[in-house]
Amino acid sequence: MLSQRVGILIIGVLATATFWLCRRYFQLRGIPGPFVARITNLCRVRWVGSRKSHEIHSRLHDQYGSVVRFGPNMVSVADPAAISVIYPARSGFLKGDFYHVFKSPDEPPDVFTAQDEGIHKTLRAPVAPYYSFSKLQSLETAIDNNIDRLFHQLDRKDSGDSTSLTTWLQAFAFDTVWAWMFTNPYGMLEMGSTEEKKTLESNWEIFQIIGPLSQSSTLRNLAGIINAILTALKIDSIPQLHKHTVSLIKSREEQFESSSEELNASDNVDMMTQLLLMKSKNSMIPPWTVSSLSLLNVFAGSDSTAVVMGTMWHNLLLHRDSMQCLYNELLEHEAQGSLTRPVPKWKEVRGLAYLDACLNEALRLHPPFCLPFERVVPDTGLSIGDYYLPPGTLVGMSPYVVGRYKPVFGQDADQWRPERWLECSPQDQRKMESSMITFGAGRRVCLGKNVAIMEIKKLIPAILLRYDIKLLDPTSFKVENSWFFRQEGLDVEMKKRDGSA
């Protein structure tokens, strides 16, 4: 009797497994892609684990077309025409479970990880106005102060010495966001290069783990179990920099709660104080909003900005004609009295045509985030070209792949050519701009987009006007991807220009 029950149980398990395997295999059977992707997500895990998933994804789309099956239930789309469908301004396409790995199981959702549209709106709506250009005066002050600190460090170096421009850009981006959030900079610019690099790379060490885990529901669940075990055993797996940031945020919240000082948002206060003031006047805001947003600003904001600046500098140094064009534009505006030194004002650089073209080209070629932004197909299903995706299918678009889509950006889409943004018609320019999802799209556009743009547009001209820079080894620049890009090998020789104060 027992053996009969065991046999029935085994048959039931096998039948269930066979059903699910067949369902996984056949529900997207008409969509092209690697055979192994039809039956397992392990190929996706391996692609991200290789740190070259952006290149692999791009090759897969070159081989199979605009719509490619990446996993049993995951489809990647390359055609920018699908952006407004997959990432609409209205609700409908929820974020997938991919985003679970970016927070601990016991942490509440933030504006990035929230899947529920209602929670996302509650978290985002009250704070969004603080990220508009008109509200970022305190950010410009932080940028100016940190450019001065960066120049002080660079001026002290002997002319002709090799220096890692990547590390300086990362340190600047981190200190600037830190000062914007908490008034005083962290001090990354004053650290020695070895200590500085080690501290800055703590985020990358985390993403090397959670990047691959994000590609498989089984591994995501395993990550939660591992985290629970580590917590139970009191094993610390959180980088010191992250812990220090959390501690400072908590301390600032406690100080604000106990303070009797009257403040208002029009005072010269840092971003965290503005957020705390906003929260104190709105009882509907979840209690964790300020702390979660502050962490996002510090870590996601600084890393992503540094990647874009690194991409810009690498290509400007590699293509000296582009750098000369940008330099000439700056000198021309300076001669007209519309650009000041040593640090140009935001109002002076926000509309420079060639600077805009270089920034757009950097955002297009190497966006900071290079995995598909996953969404869940709603109950209505989704038709993409000749293909139908049933409800529950995961669908996503990678900023890296979309930004190199040749029917929109040209047959030279893999090449650096800022002039593509200047030579085209206004209609084609709008089409290219709407075809980039570097900062997301629809209802989920990144809050920090304007923060990054202001930092980049002020720092790049300031450095170029002050220093003559030469790339020491054009072949040494390397990029890796595990959700965020990581760059290294941007070693340069910097010489202060004659007449620079």
Swiss-Prot record:
UniProt-listed InterPro entries: Cyt_P450 (IPR001128), Cyt_P450_CS (IPR017972), Cyt_P450_E_grp-IV (IPR002403), Cyt_P450_sf (IPR036396), Cytochrome_P450_monoxygenase (IPR050121)
GO molecular function, one term: heme binding
GO annotation (BP), single: mycotoxin biosynthetic process
CC terms in the record's Gene Ontology section: membrane
Gene3D superfamilies membership: Cytochrome P450
Subcellular location: Membrane
Pathway annotation from the record: Secondary metabolite biosynthesis; terpenoid biosynthesis
Keywords noted in UniProt: Heme, Iron, Membrane, Metal-binding, Monooxygenase, Oxidoreductase, Transmembrane, Transmembrane helix
Membrane topology: Single-pass membrane protein
Applied biotechnology: Shearone derivatives produced by this cluster are interesting candidates for Alzheimer's disease (AD) therapy since they moderately inhibit aggregation of amyloid beta 42 (Abeta42).
EC number(s) stated in the UniProt entry for this protein: 1.-.-.-
Enzyme class: oxidoreductase
Biological role: Cytochrome P450 monooxygenase; part of the cluster that mediates the biosynthesis of shearones, diterpenoid pyrones (DPs) which are structurally diverse meroterpenoids consisting of a diterpene linked by a pyrone, and which may exhibit a range of bioactivities. Whitin the pathway, esdpH takes part in the molecular scaffold modification via the hydroxylation at C-6' and can transform shearone C into shearone E, shearone D into shearone F, and shearone H into shearone I, the latter being the final product of the pathway.
Protein name (Swiss-Prot/TrEMBL): Cytochrome P450 monooxygenase esdpH
Gene name of the record: esdpH
